């Protein structure tokens, strides 16, 4: 509204998520803090991570899925299954997908087909770690618009997990396996933009998450 307010306190807690917390600090530039509060390292907004994620659906037209407990299974069986010793990630139930959810991903598909698919599918979520990179970051334009700059990394291990999960679904009786590897739009797990550490030259926060 254009008015300035002054709030005095011993402590302030900034807890606005990985994107907005970084954006608030980047917007706080002043003569005293030319790069924004807590940004003497220049790392505010950098090292944005979000997880590598794939939605996978096993489909069998002759087996109806009547589950009532939609989020009861999680597997780490392939976590250390890489010959290179690289963590592959985690598999968990996605929850029971419904026709309207499939419609969002495949708007051209007829509703009756999506309903049949939803009633005869087993749905899992594959999650692997992405790695911190200063090229993956949150920035704020001069006009105040928040931008996310992101390029997927560590996909080799994630793709190995996808192959293992696909084989598993085939073995347990799903002749058709569909998958969708998610991109930046699946960002509910974002983190990393205010990195903590013991060296203020290489971190934004200390080991107690204080700036």
Report residues per predicted region:
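Short low-complexity stretches enriched in small and charged residues
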Residues: 12-15, 104-108, 170-178
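Glycine-rich loop(s) and the adjacent beta-strand/alpha-helix scaffold that form part
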Residues: 2-68
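Glycine-/small-residue-rich beta-strand-loop submotif within the FAD-binding core of flavoenzymes
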Residues: 1-2, 196
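A glycine-rich dinucleotide-binding beta-alpha-beta segment and adjacent secondary-structure elements
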Residues: 153-211
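Generic structural signal for hydrophobic core residues of well-folded globular domains
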Residues: 28, 128-130, 172
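FAD cofactor-binding and catalytic pocket of flavoenzymes
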Residues: 41-155, 159, 190, 202-205, ...
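Short, functionally important structural connectors and interaction interfaces within domains
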Residues: 36, 40, 132, 186-188, ...
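N-terminal start-of-chain detector that recognizes signal peptides
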Residues: 19, 28-31, 95-99, 110-113, ...
């Amino acid at each position: 509204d254009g008015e300035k307010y002054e709030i005095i306190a011993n402590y302030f807690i900034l807890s606005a998520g990985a994107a907005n917390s970084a954006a608030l600090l980047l917007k706080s530039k002043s003569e005293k803090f030319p790069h924004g509060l807590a940004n003497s390292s220049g790392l505010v907004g950098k090292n944005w991570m979000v997880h590598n994620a794939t939605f996978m659906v096993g489909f069998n037209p002759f087996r109806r899925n009547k589950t009532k407990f939609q989020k009861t299974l999680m597997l780490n069986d392939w976590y250390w299954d890489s010959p290179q010793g690289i963590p592959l990630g985690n598999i968990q139930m996605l929850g029971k997908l419904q026709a309207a959810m499939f419609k969002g991903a495949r708007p051209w598909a007829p509703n009756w087909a999506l309903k049949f698919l939803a009633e005869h599918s087993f749905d899992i979520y594959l999650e692997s770690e992405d790695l911190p990179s200063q090229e993956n970051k949150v920035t704020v334009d001069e006009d105040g618009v928040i931008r996310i700059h992101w390029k997927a990394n560590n996909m080799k291990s994630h793709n190995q997990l996808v192959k293992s999960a696909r084989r598993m679904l085939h073995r347990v009786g799903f002749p058709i396996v569909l998958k969708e590897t998610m991109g930046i739009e699946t960002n509910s797990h974002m983190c990393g933009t205010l990195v903590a550490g013991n060296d203020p030259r290489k971190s934004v926060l200390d080991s107690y998450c204080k700036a």
